[in-house]
Amino acid sequence: LNNQNHCISIFTGNLPPSKALFLRLENAFLICNTYEIIEIVSFKEFIETELRAWARLKGHLYLGREKLKNQYSYKIQKIVKNDYLQKASWGKKMQGIDTSNPKLKDLDLSDDILVKAPDNNGLLTRGIVTQENSPIYDFELYYKEQVWSNPISVLYEEGKNLQWNATTDIPWNEIPNLNPVLEKAICQIMTYLVENEFSALYIPAKFVSKINPYYMEVPLFLSSLMNDEARHIEVFTKRANANGGGFQYSSEVTQKSLFSLFKEDDYIKSSFLLHVMGEGTFVDLLSFLEKYMPDEATKKIIRLSKRDEMRHVAYGIEHVKSAIEQNPNRINALKNTAFKRKEFMDEVNGESSLLIESLAILAGGSDEPDAYKRGFYLVEELKQKMNENRVKRLINIGMDEDLANDISKVHTPNFM
């Protein structure tokens, strides 16, 4: 036995042959390589029969016993094939621990992030070693270019740092009594916002379980994004019901527009329509609302929500931009997606008239003819600004200016 070098030595003391002892052996042999030898050091002299039987049962080779000073050495060689094809890492300590500020970007889970997730990567992430014969999950989104956005770790940290509470962070009792016409306009706007936020919540939820968690940062970020949208639904619902009003009307054009978003099953196309086109335009709408809301409490609601939405847009821009860089042919696919959506929306004439009127009343301050006319003009200016900013975002992701203009012009009149 002296010539048979062992790779692992397990001290079992006075443990008798039992479930506790065999559990330790089971795990030791599970992670060692084929033909490696494991030494069991025990105070027990007469456990050879049980160890030989266990080794035979598991397909290993019992090599024998050696008398040591006050204890005994038993050696078993692993014969069966490896359960793990690589060793787990050890000795790692991530940055930020010593300052009690570890960030997601500081994790060093692997030498590289592969362009394609390993086929056997189940509900686990980089750095976890998978046992052979584990089930294959068949995640639909398993290429990095399908899901990745370069600033995703930073955006995730930002989302945590900028969390706010829709109950305690809004001075609800400071909302003043408003003219019923103005309050009704605000309630109609809040109704519309809630509808759109439900789409922004449900659409990422469709895709989270399809993303291979090898790219861990993506489902984590999308989960934080969904938490943002849930908070927006809550806060807009509360504002609609905070001041003697309540929810108002949903329009066919709004629901049809959101349905065209919801039914898109390609993640890159969905990210393009939702984050780049929709939420990007939504940010301009929120800037408009923040400017013209008549009270500070409602302004704060809009301002905090807009800050979240800007983070979502940042993810989408970098996600789609990266996907286009990897495959420029995607530009044509995204163009076709935008025009296909327009064809679907052409079945409904115009825009949500209830929303546009409410925006005009809000911006003008009342429904008096001159004020309403002024507000309507401001809404038309908003639409132009939305178009200009959409073009900028489309150029940013890699489209030429002419195509960017064409795609922006066919964007849904529902804004989202």
Q: Where do the language-model regions lie?
A:
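A beta-strand-loop signature enriched in Asp, Gly, Thr, and Trp
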Residues: 301-305, 316-341
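Intrinsic disorder
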Residues: 1-119
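Amphipathic alpha-helical segments within well-ordered protein domains
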Residues: 205-209, 287-290, 303, 317, ...
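Short, surface-exposed basic-aromatic patches at helix termini and helix-loop junctions that form
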Residues: 53-59, 241, 291-294, 325
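Terminal targeting/low-complexity segments that flank the catalytic cores of oxidoreductases
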Residues: 24, 85-220, 241-246, 253, ...
